[in-house]
Amino acid sequence: MAPNLSPNPSNSLDAFAAEKLAGLEAAALRRRLAVTARGPEAAAERGGRRLVSFSCNDYLGLAHDPRVIAAASDALRRYGAGAGASRLVTGNSPPLAALEERLARHKGKEAALVFGSGYLANLGIAPALVGQGDLILIDDLGHSCLFAGARMSGALTLRFTHNDVAQLRALLAEQRGAARRALILTERVFSMDGDRAPLAEILALAGAYDAWTLVDDAHGLGVVEPGQRAPLEMGTLSKTLGSYGGYLCASRAVIDLLTSRARSLVYTTGLPPASAAAALKALEIVEAEPEHAARPLMLARRFTARLGLPEATSPIVPVLVGAAESALALSAALEARGFLVVAIRPPTVAPGTARLRVAFSAAHDAAQVDALAEALAELAPDSLRAA
């Protein structure tokens, strides 16, 4: 059959994109990139305006610490701007090797493996460990990359209701016998709600059913007490450590296996040496100066107390709004008052639960926290009553 060469807008790429964008716009779900110049002390500049940012995961302000910047600058001069190859070729730089050794020691594990990002780490870990005939059980509020890695593995993947240990137990009792291997995926601190997983109970269940547990510690490292460690401890270098990248800490055997089998490590360029050096210096500071760790949570609790919200258990506090349009409007109103608090909308969160995700840093001061609380009390009293 000869191809139809007549113009057909409904089949064109641009028409398809325009139609989808119109639907997103109508639902207040279209995403846009906004140029943001981050500075020290929780400052951010957008559109020529200086704002106080409560939408950054730099929980200890280490991205602007002069010691971290100096470490990155030194690595940049010594090793160049990029790794130049995958880690298994020539992209495994000295700062990367030193960082892995320090991460493993910090987590109490035998070894560590650094990936290009936390997302890439979770894309690679599950498929390297489980597959068809295996079982993955994942918390319903787990990060998107946990679900993406689970799907790529080919294992039977079942969700359990957020932090519902009883349901997790029931699923293990029902499904574990038919599976060769089982993997439980959860987070130490949940990124959009700021609450914490009941890890002691989950790990006890895992032991009873011979299941492996991966804990995503992206938002916990350095700012919350870790409690009991899981066999698989992954996280990022881009939040508390102020740099970029992701990692897994585990036994030497597991790390050696992933070095050969994790496709998101094998088939991508290694992390830039400067990023690794920055993360290494930041981790050294976290360990040497533990007095900073409690400040983000202290400020978060000051904020929740001012507004009558449930007491914070991490530096992340959600202010639930509901409709995406309302969350955008509240974010814009706060920006007009000098605060950058970005609206979080579906599909990042469930429909009807759009929110402002307020993130606290050691770089904030009490006056900034109180001013934000005062503005929210005036602008969003209904959201605060609903909490």
Swiss-Prot record:
InterPro entries the UniProt entry points to: Aminotransferase_I/II_large, AON_synthase_class-II, PyrdxlP-dep_Trfase, PyrdxlP-dep_Trfase_major, PyrdxlP-dep_Trfase_small
Binding-site positions, pyridoxal 5'-phosphate: G118, Y119, S191, D216, D217, A218, H219, T236, L237, S238, K239
Entry's Gene Ontology BP terms: biotin biosynthetic process
First-level EC class: transferase
This protein's record includes keyword Cytoplasm: no
Pathway assigned in UniProt: Cofactor biosynthesis; biotin biosynthesis
Cofactor(s) required, per the database record: pyridoxal 5'-phosphate
Sequence intervals crossing the membrane: none
Catalytic activity: 6-carboxyhexanoyl-[ACP] + L-alanine + H(+) = (8S)-8-amino-7-oxononanoate + holo-[ACP] + CO2
A Gene Ontology molecular function term of the record: pyridoxal phosphate binding
Keyword field contains Manganese: no
Pfam families from the UniProt entry: Aminotran_1_2
EC number(s) on file: 2.3.1.47
Sites of N6-(pyridoxal phosphate)lysine modification: K239
Residues involved in substrate binding: R31, R38, H143, T348
Keywords: Acyltransferase, Biotin biosynthesis, Pyridoxal phosphate, Transferase
Protein family: Belongs to the class-II pyridoxal-phosphate-dependent aminotransferase family. BioF subfamily.
Subunit structure: Homodimer.
Function: Catalyzes the decarboxylative condensation of pimeloyl-[acyl-carrier protein] and L-alanine to produce 8-amino-7-oxononanoate (AON), [acyl-carrier protein], and carbon dioxide.
Protein name: 8-amino-7-oxononanoate synthase
Organism: Methylorubrum populi (strain ATCC BAA-705 / NCIMB 13946 / BJ001)
Lineage per the UniProt record: Bacteria, Pseudomonadati, Pseudomonadota, Alphaproteobacteria, Hyphomicrobiales
